[in-house]
Amino acid sequence: MEPLGNWRSLRAPLPPMLLLLLLQVAGPVGALAETLLNAPRAMGTSSSPPSPASVVAPGTTLFEESRLPVFTLDYPHVQIPFEITLWILLASLAKIGFHLYHKLPTIVPESCLLIMVGLLLGGIIFGVDEKSPPAMKTDVFFLYLLPPIVLDAGYFMPTRPFFENIGTIFWYAVVGTLWNSIGIGVSLFGICQIEAFGLSDITLLQNLLFGSLISAVDPVAVLAVFENIHVNEQLYILVFGESLLNDAVTVVLYNLFKSFCQMKTIETIDVFAGIANFFVVGIGGVLIGIFLGFIAAFTTRFTHNIRVIEPLFVFLYSYLSYITAEMFHLSGIMAITACAMTMNKYVEENVSQKSYTTIKYFMKMLSSVSETLIFIFMGVSTVGKNHEWNWAFVCFTLAFCLMWRALGVFVLTQVINRFRTIPLTFKDQFIIAYGGLRGAICFALVFLLPAAVFPRKKLFITAAIVVIFFTVFILGITIRPLVEFLDVKRSNKKQQAVSEEIYCRLFDHVKTGIEDVCGHWGHNFWRDKFKKFDDKYLRKLLIRENQPKSSIVSLYKKLEIKHAIEMAETGMISTVPTFASLNDCREEKIRKVTSSETDEIRELLSRNLYQIRQRTLSYNRHSLTADTSERQAKEILIRRRHSLRESIRKDSSLNREHRASTSTSRYLSLPKNTKLPEKLQKRRTISIADGNSSDSDADAGTTVLNLQPRARRFLPEQFSKKSPQSYKMEWKNEVDVDSGRDMPSTPPTPHSREKGTQTSGLLQQPLLSKDQSGSEREDSLTEGIPPKPPPRLVWRASEPGSRKARFGSEKP
């Protein structure tokens, strides 16, 4: 018996995990799964002495000897990750199948199709096993599936329209949620007082709690529907922003009423504490999100040597903000939204382009997978035995949800329109009220109710599922035809060009200046103040210095400098026609506008002049938004190529004589009142005294000097001996020179020279008066022949005897 005693002494302190390892190595293959499941339980509960069969002799092993298996099946070992992978694969294949037929997602929202797939799977599971399918746990929803969706929504949210409408969004989210919660709760409590319905055991606080959770407008359902109808940006940001902040308010009200239901007596101080908790939860979540967003930006400032881990910080800090807020019982939705918006502004400038692309794709992938799993599990969890049907409670719940939602939107809009520059129209109000879709937030909160405190929990679950399915299926399917029927303004699908964005920024600065002069503190005023504070403090602290510029922009800068040097060397600058000279030559016949057209123009201006400009495209979950810097760089490169192509084409159209003259001429532009060297000043005096310029020539704004000497020719009637170069006034038509025409022009008469005046201006502005140029245009304008621009009076260095003008005769 001594060996048995030795075995007992060895077996007593043996850890259970070591026994499991021994079972895996030496146990029979067929009984491996059963051994893994039952071995710890048998070890922990067995207290009987071992049987004689278990006693082993010295030198023998405890287990029977087994051979090496060829094939082994161990499903319990990988059950959880295997099933999760299959669910995600099934959801992804379902989405691929929906989008194979392009017309199906435009008719039926994707959320409806996913719920139908979940209902089908739940029915199959319930029919085979005759048990309720596994319901999604609320902790799994709130801790793992909801954060990626909110992170994606906050990170890619158009921040400027959001902050321009922040007052209206908070008005709908806070006051509107209180309106709906209290209205639905009190109305349902009135229905419960009717004894015929059998609902007298439901108290007022329970109805208020149910009203708060049923008022949750789900951003997942809203995004799934509104991404396909492409409404205008203002309407989209109002509905989406309200649904995002509405969830945070709903969760706060839910926890508040849940705490009241668990109290035996409620005092006045508890009510004030609940109101204070309402603001603390929301503001605390925002502060946590902004703080961790700043830390993320500061961390990525030092990752320029380790680019691989840059995307990791974005997801870690955002998820850390969510779980930190939940740890302190603050609003995790507000925290992760604020963190995402902060990182979008600062982190993007620190990370590389490849890291930014990784962040975008991975974030879109996580949110799409989470959204798909939520809708499928909603359908699966619907099928089961956890329902209680009551016609009165279910029907009145649906009616009160629709009624209080519509009343709340119309009443609150009448108040907020008094403070809005752009009032919301009746069509916008109707779409906002119609877009109050319920979804996963409401579904998870109703399953989270404790059954001990709420004996009619199954009735609440049934009513919530009916409201969710009605809003997602009926309202979600019919909202697109309604938008088309009401002719609601759609989103602008055209991307802004670089010039348009420059003009938009110019208008912003102008409006900021106007507000500053008027003493009005509007959006532009506060945006300008924040930008100054951001440039002075935040960007210096959070953004890495010596940021590398885009290679395309640097290449464009080098090409422009090289092209400018070539133009200066070849004299092409002096021959390029100016906009002012072309504009003076162009005569357009403007048709008189009729009174009906004038009224139509006024109506269009009054409707669209002060509208918020469409700066971004509508949200689309299945495609990524174009990067602004990449689009601008591409446009700059395209414009550069186009300008080079036009310059080459224009240069090739010049005749050979003009090319020869421009290649040998050198022009120098001097500003007004520039002191010339003594020799040049002497020559200019001789030229003016010679009668080749008028008194107004001395007041010219710009002097163009041709420094290339021409052929020397002398006229005896002007000079008795050979004299050095002097400066003469020449008439030069820039448009004819540029277009390569050989049409001779008549030199101006002395009378016209005396009549013409020079105006101070830039190098390429016309130097003739309007009357003189107009008279010449009348003579030259004929049908089918474009008008000739007026000649241009310039200083030119030439030989005194040279009377040959560029556009004149050589007669002495």
UniProtKB/Swiss-Prot annotation:
What does the record give as the reaction this protein catalyses?
Na(+)(in) + H(+)(out) = Na(+)(out) + H(+)(in)
Mark out the compositionally biased spans (Basic and acidic residues).
648-660
Q: Which residues are glycosylated?
A: N350
Q: According to the UniProt entry, which residue ranges have a biased composition of type Polar residues?
A: 757-772
**Topology with regard to the membrane?**
Multi-pass membrane protein
- Compartment(s) of residence: Apical cell membrane
Sorted alphabetically, the keyword list is: Antiport, Cell membrane, Glycoprotein, Ion transport, Membrane, Phosphoprotein, Sodium, Sodium transport, Transmembrane, Transmembrane helix, Transport
Q: GO cellular component terms?
A: apical plasma membrane; membrane; plasma membrane
The record's tissue-specificity note reads:
Expressed in skeletal muscle, colon and kidney. Lower levels in the testis, prostate, ovary, and small intestine. In the distal colon, expressed along the cryptal axis.
Ranges that cross the membrane: 80-100, 107-127, 138-158, 169-189, 209-229, 237-257, 278-298, 308-328, 361-381, 392-412, 430-450, 459-479
Q: What is the effect of changing R806Q?
A: In a breast cancer sample; somatic mutation
**Which parts of this chain are annotated as the region Disordered?**
648-701, 733-812
Q: Which domain of life is it from?
A: Eukaryota
Give start-end positions of Low complexity composition bias. Answer: 686-701
Q: Which GO terms describe its molecular function?
A: potassium:proton antiporter activity; sodium:proton antiporter activity
Please give a single GO biological process term from the UniProt record. sodium ion import across plasma membrane
User: Which InterPro entries is this protein grouped with?
Assistant: Cation/H_exchanger_CPA1 (IPR018422), Cation/H_exchanger_TM (IPR006153), NaH_exchanger (IPR004709), NHE-2/4 (IPR001953), NHE_CaM-bd (IPR032103)
Describe, as the record does, how this protein assembles with itself and its partners: Interacts with CHP1 and CHP2.
Q: Describe the task this protein carries out.
A: Plasma membrane Na(+)/H(+) antiporter. Mediates the electroneutral exchange of intracellular H(+) ions for extracellular Na(+). Major apical Na(+)/H(+) exchanger in the base of the colonic crypt. Controls in the colonic crypt intracellular pH (pHi) to direct colonic epithelial cell differentiation into the absorptive enterocyte lineage at the expense of the secretory lineage.
Q: Which family does it belong to?
A: Belongs to the monovalent cation:proton antiporter 1 (CPA1) transporter (TC 2.A.36) family.
- What name does UniProt use for this protein? Sodium/hydrogen exchanger 2
